[in-house]
């Protein structure tokens, strides 16, 4: 009997049992689709799984793990063969079908170290019934024993035959059991309180790996099958075309040929560290490395960046070459971008599935923030699904220099885990201190591409000359205007929002009514929508975006609602202007200005600011980089500032005036961040080590199979980018926007896009009045507009 005839026989005998409606899919059809999805996956990925499994896992042979995965997939929806579930297909009520499944399956299904991993995977495939560290859904679940439909036993009868036909594997028959709900809950309680506590660290690591192979693999097959059943045209979890290099060449203006380091990247089979100056082609090198390694049976690419803005830009670029159906974006705003890409998809269930597939790395190429990637290694959300999908993936970490020591320490541990699982990585930086790179080399094996020794010509390029000034930046106001009058695009970077706004206010007085034509203020305290518009405005003024690409949105100007394009005249295209910004320009925007005025900052931050001026290091555009020493850091004797004082002082002492090249900045960087300086300070070393140890800490709490579900206070221990004590980050909507845009009648998307995030100082809390809305607080007594952001008044005190 063929596969199709065997399946047809099962389908006919169980035709009355549905798995889902709209479209109607029978349980037999969905089960078959899931089995085919995992068969295709194993055909593409089994080799690498098996290779690393045999080196790392001793608790269960890989062949048995595959059988357990297939068994879990086969029976995961058997709970739908109940009258209780079938009734939900018409009344849209919620179902507990994973629990129903457990009532007819062995309670020791897939037992490893006395933990029934197969049973847990089935229970867990929709909701974390078991795997929570504090409290569990099953403890509160009010469910009665289900009534199974006649014919459900056919699935048990066909199980060995279908598995043998589809996979060529022989499995032992499974007979239906009769477990009460109390039996199931008792089993889960024993697992939680007894069976996981005495596991040694090696066993716990193995249990984690086995569990996400089974649980993650089950969810993978379930969702891939569901996506295809929804008839989404062109969906595939695999690349259709791995020829990224050709797409890249076509996307680069005036492309001639690849550089030596890019060619070397395209021929490298190892993990790499790509060390190349800003604007010289690191991104292209990493993608050429990716193309080469996709040929070696790797099936996914994860490209991480520091911010949502930089992630969005990279997403827009790469999806043009790879295709929307194969490219995903993940970060906190990604859902709203997805809604814009699928406006015709009004079905909430379908849209939720599209979002799920992107959020948990189902698509071949995923671009997103580093946080969205790393959080899955802290057992957050569907960590098991993410970890399964990350297997056999290539990981690109761009702008690695921009992360704090705590995040770097955790990233190092994650890369250790991934390389032990067979993954490869590409780290990229224009300004990574040698001491940090050496910390990574102690734990990881990778090949360095670029650097001063390999690409000396690139590092000998000079973008211009440095001027060190003892006064404050605000005292250079007339110089800024003078440079602008010469027809230059001027970049002014302040270390705090307060200073940026103050500088902008002073320039406004000089420009008067023409300020909107010549000045742009950009910081983090704008609404999400206005930040996107600000980015568009900057690109438009620099000539990197055309008029037709500007968004048609409404903004608040002088307390009134105005069309964005009304303030963006066509004549502003490529017209010289002054951008006053904070650190948001360091990694968020791909911009190129003619001259820089900046407050002094840590050397790595300065290098990033330098990279936003004369980006190509052209001799004919030799630029001035003016750095100002005097800072407003709070009351005398107190240090209220975004950067550590010792790093600021050391940077100021080390950097030299006059002409400089990229090699000089690397030398300064390594002197500031040296073993004797930065790592001699306990705070940096401690933060790095704390980050490195977070993975083991999460594993201890979750026992390798749990979800990190803790109180807010305990969760703070796992924050990768901690904020200063005494601050609370909250989302608010300025009342002017709420009223003018009539948001009280709008949905969550509009509320979110028109909200902004503020750091609420305790000293400021009493000045604010909030009105509770459905989703986000409304800020009542502070003015807001597109040009300035929030007007805090004379006592304004914001962080960065």
Language-model region placement:
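Accessory nucleic-acid engagement/destabilization modules that flank
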Residues: 2-241
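Conserved helicase motor
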Residues: 329-340, 497-498, 520-536, 582-586
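C-terminal helicase lobe and adjacent C-terminal extensions/tails of nucleic-acid helicase motors
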Residues: 110-114, 118, 437, 478-482, ...
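Post-DEXD/H (motif II) to motif III coupling segment of the RecA-like Helicase ATP-binding lobe
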Residues: 384-394, 400-455
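Inter-Walker segment of RecA-like/P-loop motor cores
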Residues: 324-379
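Conserved Walker A/P-loop ATP-binding site and its immediately adjacent core
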Residues: 298-322, 329-334, 434-437, 497
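Walker A/P-loop
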Residues: 268-290
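Interdomain hinge/linker at the junction between the two RecA-like core domains of SF2 helicases
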Residues: 434-484
């Amino acid at each position: 009997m063929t596969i199709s005839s065997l399946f047809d026989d099962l389908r006919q005998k169980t035709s009355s049992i549905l798995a889902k409606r709209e479209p109607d899919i029978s349980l037999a059809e969905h089960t078959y689709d899931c089995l085919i999805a995992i068969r295709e996956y194993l055909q593409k990925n089994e080799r690498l799984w098996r290779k690393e499994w045999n080196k790392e896992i001793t608790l269960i042979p890989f062949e048995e793990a595959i059988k357990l995965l297939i068994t879990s997939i086969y029976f995961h929806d058997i709970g739908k063969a109940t009258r209780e579930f079938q009734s939900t297909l018409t009344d849209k009520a919620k179902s507990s079908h994973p629990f129903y499944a457990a009532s007819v399956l062995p309670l020791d299904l897939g037992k490893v170290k006395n933990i029934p991993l197969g049973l847990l995977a089935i229970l867990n495939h929709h909701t974390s019934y078991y795997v929570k560290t504090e409290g569990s859904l099953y403890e509160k679940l009010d469910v009665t024993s289900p009534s199974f439909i006649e014919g459900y036993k056919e699935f048990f009868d066909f199980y060995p035959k279908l598995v043998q036909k589809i996979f060529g594997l022989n499995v032992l028959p499974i007979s239906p059991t009769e477990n009460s709900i109390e039996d199931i809950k008792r089993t889960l309680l024993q697992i939680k309180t007894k069976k996981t506590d005495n596991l040694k660290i090696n066993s716990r690591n193995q249990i984690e790996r086995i569990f996400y192979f089974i649980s993650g693999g089950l969810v993978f097959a379930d969702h891939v099958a569901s996506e295809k059943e929804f008839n989404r045209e062109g969906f595939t979890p695999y690349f259709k075309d791995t020829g990224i290099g050709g797409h890249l060449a076509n996307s680069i203006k005036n492309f001639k040929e690849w550089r030596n380091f890019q060619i070397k990247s395209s021929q490298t089979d190892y993990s790499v560290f790509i060390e190349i100056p800003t604007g010289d082609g690191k991104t292209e090198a990493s993608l050429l490395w990716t193309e080469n390694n996709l040929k070696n049976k790797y099936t996914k690419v994860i490209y991480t960046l520091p911010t949502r803005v930089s992630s969005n830009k990279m997403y827009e670029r790469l999806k043009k070459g790879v295709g929307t159906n194969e490219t995903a974006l993940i970060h906190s705003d990604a859902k709203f971008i997805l809604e814009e890409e699928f406006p015709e998809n009004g079905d909430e269930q379908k849209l939720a599935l599209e979002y799920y597939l992107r959020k948990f790395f189902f698509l071949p190429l995923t671009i997103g923030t580093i946080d969205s990637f790393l959080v899955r290694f802290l057992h957050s959300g569907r960590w098991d699904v993410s970890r399964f999908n990350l297997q056999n993936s290539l990981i690109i970490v761009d702008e690695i220099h921009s992360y704090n020591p705590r995040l770097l320490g955790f990233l190092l541990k994650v890369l250790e885990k991934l390389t032990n699982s067979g993954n490869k990585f590409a780290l990229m930086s224009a300004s990574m201190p040698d001491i940090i790179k050496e910390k990574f080399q102690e734990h990881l094996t990778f090949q360095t591409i670029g650097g001063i020794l390999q690409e000396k010509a690139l590092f000998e390029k000079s973008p211009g000359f440095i001027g060190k000034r003892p006064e404050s930046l605000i005292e250079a106001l007339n110089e800024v205007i003078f440079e602008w009058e010469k027809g230059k695009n001027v970049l002014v970077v302040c270390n705090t929002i307060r200073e940026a706004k103050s500088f902008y206010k002073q320039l406004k007085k000089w420009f008067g009514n023409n300020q909107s034509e010549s000045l742009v203020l950009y910081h983090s305290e704008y609404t999400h929508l206005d930040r996107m518009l600000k980015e568009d405005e900057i690109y438009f003024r620099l000539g990197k975006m055309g008029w037709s690409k500007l968004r048609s949105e409404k903004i608040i100007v002088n307390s009134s609602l105005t069309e964005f394009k009304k303030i963006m005249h066509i004549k502003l295209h490529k017209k010289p202007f002054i951008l006053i910004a904070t650190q948001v320009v360091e990694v968020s925007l791909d911009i190129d200005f003619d001259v820089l005025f900046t407050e002094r900052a840590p050397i790595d931050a300065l290098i990033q600011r330098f990279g936003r001026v004369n980006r190509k290091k052209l001799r004919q555009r030799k630029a001035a980089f003016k750095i100002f020493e005097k800072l407003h850091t709070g009351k005398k004797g107190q240090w209220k500032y975004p950067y550590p004082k010792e790093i600021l002082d050391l940077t100021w002492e080390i950097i030299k005036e006059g002409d400089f090249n990229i090699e000089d900045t690397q030398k300064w960087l390594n002197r500031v961040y040296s073993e004797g300086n930065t790592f001699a300070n306990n705070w940096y070393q401690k933060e790095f080590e704390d980050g490195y140890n977070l993975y083991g800490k999460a594993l201890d709490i979750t026992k390798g199979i749990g979800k990190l579900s803790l109180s807010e206070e305990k969760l703070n221990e796992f924050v990768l980018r901690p904020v200063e004590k005494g601050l609370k980050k909250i989302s608010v909507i300025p009342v002017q926007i709420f009223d003018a845009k009539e948001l009280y009648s709008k949905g969550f998307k509009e509320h979110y896009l028109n909200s902004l995030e503020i750091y609420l100082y305790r000293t400021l809390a009493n000045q604010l009045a909030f009105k509770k809305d459905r989703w986000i607080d409304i800020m009542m007594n502070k003015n807001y507009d597109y040009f300035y952001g929030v007007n805090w008044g004379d006592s304004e005190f914001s962080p960065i």
